[in-house]
Amino acid sequence: MGKLANISTNLKNSLQSGLHKTGQSLNQAGQSLKAGAKKLILYIPKDYEYDSGRGNGLQDLVKAAEDLGIEVQREERNGIATAQNSLSTIQNILGFSERGVVLSAPQLDKLLQKYKISKAPGSSENVAKNLGNAQTLLSGIQSILGSVMAGMDLDEILKNKGSELDLAKAGLELTNSLIENIANSVQTLDTFSEQISQLGTKLQNVKGLGTLGDKLKNFSGFSKAGLGLEVISGLLSGATAALVLADKNASTDRKVGAGFELANQVVGNITKAVSSYILAQRVAAGLSNTGPVSALIASTVALAISPLAFAGIADKFNNAKALESYAERFKKLGYEGDSLLAEYQRGTGTIDASVTAVNTALAAISGGVSAAAAGSLVGAPIALLVSGITGIISTILQYSKQAMFEHVANKIHDKIVDWEKKHNGKNYFENGYDSRYLADLQDNMRQLQNLNKELQAERVIRITQQQWDNNIGNLAGISRLGEKVMSGKAYADAFEEGKLIKADTFVQLDSATGVINTSKSDNVKTQHILFRTPLLTPGVENRERIQTGKYEYITKLNINRVDSWKITDGATNSTFDLTNVVQRIGIELDHADNVTKTKETKIIANLGDGNDDVFIGSGTTEVDGGNGLDRVHYSRGDYGALTIDATNESVQGSYTVKRFVETGKALHEVTATQSVLVGSREEKIEYRHSNNTQHAGYYTTDTLKSVEEIIGTSRNDIFKGSKFDDAFHGGDGVDNIDGNAGNDRLFGGKGFDIIDGGDGDDFIDGGQGDDILHGGKGNDILCTVKGGNDSISDSGGNDRLSFADSNLKDLTFEKVNHHLMITNVKKEKVTIQNWFREADYAKTVHNYQATADEKIEEIIGRQGERITSKQIDELIEKGKGKIDQSELERIAESSALLKESKFASNSLNKLVSSAGAFASSNDNRVGLGVPTSLYEHTQSVQFVRAA
């Protein structure tokens, strides 16, 4: 009973405003009422015998009629002849005889028999003994007749006939329709009698209208947990149409057609009765009933039927059809959630179609009545009456609609719970993500089979994050199981020789604890760990569903976060691209979803043995390269310029890398909310996902250990080397690179770079752009390529300058002031600063003593041809400031020179060739390629030392 009381209270609250408005209309109708039916006769025809065991107490009706002053007439005793112009008295509850309005006892008895089966308190077995209910029923009919037939003098009408009689007939038929529809909308006799009385009372007295909601509690459907399509057939008297609408195999057109059929069954009688009544009123009042008037009525009805109301319903059925088609694939993969969504769309589409069709028809009736009654004082009361009736029906429908929606949702909920029981408690929604992953694997298999070749790795480990799925979220909201859904799931698979292999024997991926372990190499020499989609931060999700309003719920997301990913590798030569690992968490966002406050997830990578490559992402990263030649790349993504200062490092390969990521967009994990509507119920479910989100800028610091090489960003990087051997690559941007002590390998890349080798035997490649190169002390090798004008200075040592892409004979050497200017065929210049300064001072300054060696001892062309600083000085002197091209051709053709420099040429060519191929702009994720080594480490060291 507690549940019934709650339903009653909810009904009362939801109907209050609608009923109040309806009551106002009905009250206005009541104000115009006069004494209606002069005589009401309870008519029992000849040969009719009612069975008290079969019926529901007709004897009580007879007694009640007598008490109410209603004449009871038996045809065989009184010989009353039924008028020939009767409205089928035997077929309807009410009709006309020559003496007045006839209340048909057989029809009443037949109507009451339907309640025989009810066992509820106040049902047929009890009501048959209750005279009060019979009196309530008959007095209600009297009241309705009084409203519909207000102002009519039945004696005169029956005597004179004509148009007034037609009006009376129409009013009587309307009353019949109202009674029948009320009868079809209830389940017990006491409810039926009370509803009849209620309508009649409200027509005459608006007091107590607010209690109508209490009467609705007697609808048996509301007291059941299972409210669904059966309520439509009971409440709206459309069993056949409801069966069609419930048929999942029925076409959309058939469903929509059934919806209209249902509407006709519900309101068809009222429509016909109202039309007849209004037209009769117009004729009786002497008003026009011609074509223009009919057109007015028709147009008003047409305007009331909006195709937009049905467009959304058609969309539901179309969505259901599309979902069912989509679901077929995932059914084969073990997941039927999309099919459940289609089932929900069909079920709620059925309800929407039915209710919308009925409401549309009711609106059309009201519109037609208002139009037809225009200009008729007689028609005004019935227009208000119909408005009130349709308002009540619409309000009941809307409340019933929510209950029916929930019934469909409950079925979905139960199917999910049953599935989990049958599968040992496995999470249904996790199974959904599993199916999505398998489908993705199938879709991309051809591309994945080429990964080993494209990435030049014996084994490719692919880590895929299945992120939030809207269909899965919708299903969780509909079924009220949002607490069990997850934001996604991460998977690992592997490929060798283009074939998919089982990965869990050598890959450990644990998103809950933040562990990625690829150390079990199984003698594989090279492997590439590819994060194909953004990997969410580690931790365990917990959800709690909270009610925030009458029909509003939110499933809050709480995450027990782990502060870092821990990556462990073994002896294999491995490549890790961490740029798709989400490290930034958007804690606070502004109204435009820009991140204003963040939290960071660190990456700790222990690479073990092997020559490893790591591409750094958006957040703090700690890399321990272990043994082997390891490289750290900052060339993918735009995560701030580097500032590296290793001048005080005491251990080789140790660096602290500071970055400031400027205002812009970066990969963040953010929390979002999906809203799911189940009729009036709104479910909001929080989930997390990755997004390239606008942020206000942030600082981050990386710690590198046992790292042999660092590749910079496309921004303006600063490198300050250690006292050990360093290898730096500036990439794009204006970079400032200082090798400091040690035998360093320094690459500028694109941009206008400033590179200083410092002490030690250094290799310096300015790359493209106008670069400033300084070899410093030691025996340095400087390299220049086309694409810029370089300025070179040197300060001691046995140094060499290589033109990686120019033949020696194609260069022009000339003296410009104190400098040596070398020009290639593209008119790009390399200026060696102060080449002639010491010699010029010696010529002009008495007893000048040379203090510096600022010459490059040897200049080498791309074929290994070379010219020494001594030869340059001699030929410049000979050519009066410029070397003749024939001299350069002679030097290039000197086989003795080429033979002498064979070892140097081969080693340098290999070094220069690999260095010239470097370009950070080509280092993109699309091709899935990894840049080739910029140098052969062992050979380059040997060459520098030998040179």
UniProtKB/Swiss-Prot annotation:
Q: What else is known?
A: The lktCABD operon has a complex mosaic structure that has been derived by extensive inter- and intraspecies horizontal DNA transfer and intragenic recombination events.
Return the protein name. Leukotoxin
Protein family (similarity comment): Belongs to the RTX prokaryotic toxin (TC 1.C.11) family.
- Encoding gene, per UniProt annotation: lktA
Q: Can you supply one Gene Ontology CC term for this chain's record?
A: membrane
Q: Give its localization.
A: Secreted; Host cell membrane
Q: How is it modified after translation?
A: Acylated by LktC. The toxin only becomes active when modified.
Keyword set for this entry? Calcium, Cytolysis, Host cell membrane, Host membrane, Lipoprotein, Membrane, Repeat, Secreted, Toxin, Transmembrane, Transmembrane helix, Virulence
Query: What's one GO BP annotation on this UniProt entry?
Result: killing of cells of another organism
Q: Which GO terms describe its molecular function?
A: calcium ion binding; channel activity; toxin activity
Give start and end residues of every Hemolysin-type calcium-binding repeat. Answer: 711-728, 729-746, 747-764, 765-782, 784-801
- Predominant place of localization: secreted
What is said about the domains? The transmembrane domains are believed to be involved in pore formation in target cells.
Repeat found in the keyword field: yes
